[in-house]
């Protein structure tokens, strides 16, 4: 019996399954089983409601982002600040106008005060100057008006200083006024301030005189000839023949002092001006000459002795001025007991001589004739 019941049950189950095939299915939307958690979460209604809530949340978030409290707070004060700034600007305009008006008034007042003070100071200064001038004119011996020259005849001359035979006269006497230059002579318009003839005669032969002693002038035999031995530092004297003189060396001779180029290491020294330049110098053909004593530059040899360096270089028998005994440099003149000449070329040309040597020679002849 049990064996028969089992297949009958199976047949019933199969029949039920066949019946279930033709049963109309119920859609998920019409399901009312809200208690089932799976049905509630998997249903379309729940999905739709979930999407709608998410969309609403997104909308609210976007609205919060676009129209959040910060944006609203930023926009509303901006409108209020514009109105406030306009009101402030309107309120400042009359205040600024009033300030500018007050400043302009104060500036005008300060300008008027400054001009008044300036005029008052000028008036006081003029009054003080007039008072001082009146007091100065009241003193006895004061001059009235401006004299054109300091050395006019109206002024008392200072007595001449006596010169004793044992004391050398001063070559640069004390000045009573500023030296007369070209600019001052143009301003003054007269040459009365030039030295007098007596003073010129007194200083005229100072260049050719010997040193004074207690007994009188020193003779040439009494002059102390200082014989100094030639040291090992002295450069050897090299006599260059005329054949070794090149055209480049002749072209390198300076005709003007402005053409000189100074060089301490490569230049050669001129005996007259003691300047070390790179221009061509003379070469003494005297065997007894030594060192750089026979080297003279172009301007010095022309202005001092009236000779040319090119002619001296091409002359095989040319001797330098120290070897001839006519050197007028400061060292040689001091060795001979005479004073230095200084820049004497302009005075020599003023008296009609072309060089200093000719001028000194004429002075010496005049001095010997008077003596």
From Swiss-Prot:
Q: Which residues carry this modification: Phosphoserine?
A: 142, 190
> InterPro entries this protein is in?
CDCA7/CDA7L (IPR040221), Znf-4CXXC_R1 (IPR018866)
The UniProt record lists the keyword Cytoplasm: yes
**Keyword check for Plastid:** no
Q: Name one GO biological process term.
A: regulation of DNA-templated transcription
Explain what induces or represses this protein's expression.
Answer: Activated by MYC and possibly E2F1.
* A GO CC term assigned to this protein in UniProt: nucleoplasm
| Cellular localisation | Nucleus; Cytoplasm
Q: Post-translation: what modifications?
A: Phosphorylation at Thr-163 promotes interaction with YWHAE and YWHAZ, dissociation from MYC and sequestration in the cytoplasm. In vitro, phosphorylated at Thr-163 by AKT.
Describe the effect of residue 165 to A: Abolishes phosphorylation, interaction with YHWAE and YHWAZ, and cytoplasmic localization
**Segments carrying motif Nuclear localization signal:** 160-176
| Expression (tissue specificity) | Ubiquitous with higher level in thymus and small intestine. Overexpressed in a large number of tumors, in blood from patients with acute myelogenous leukemia (AML) and in chronic myelogenous leukemia (CML) blast crisis.
Consequence of substituting residue 162 to A: Does not affect phosphorylation or interaction with YHWAE and YHWAZ
Cite the effect that the entry attributes to residue 164 to A: Abolishes phosphorylation and interaction with YHWAE and YHWAZ
> Which residue stretches belong to region Mediates transcriptional activity?
247-371
Q: Which terms are listed as keywords in the entry? A: Apoptosis, Cytoplasm, Disease variant, Isopeptide bond, Nucleus, Phosphoprotein, Transcription, Transcription regulation, Ubl conjugation
Give all Phosphothreonine modified positions. Answer: 163
Segments for region (Disordered): 60-110, 140-188
Disulfide pairs here are none
**Sequence segments annotated as region (Interaction with MYC):** 146-170
Q: What disorder does this protein's entry note?
A: Immunodeficiency-centromeric instability-facial anomalies syndrome 3: A rare disorder characterized by a variable immunodeficiency resulting in recurrent infections, facial anomalies, and branching of chromosomes 1, 9, and 16. Other variable symptoms include growth retardation, failure to thrive, and psychomotor retardation. Laboratory studies show limited hypomethylation of DNA in a small fraction of the genome in some, but not all, patients.
Function of the molecule: Participates in MYC-mediated cell transformation and apoptosis; induces anchorage-independent growth and clonogenicity in lymphoblastoid cells. Insufficient to induce tumorigenicity when overexpressed but contributes to MYC-mediated tumorigenesis. May play a role as transcriptional regulator.
Instruction: Share what the entry says about its subunit structure, partners included.
Output: Interacts with MYC (via C-terminus), YWHAE and YWHAZ.
The protein's name: Cell division cycle-associated protein 7
Native species = Homo sapiens
Q: Top-down, what is the taxonomic lineage of the species of origin?
A: Eukaryota, Metazoa, Chordata, Craniata, Vertebrata
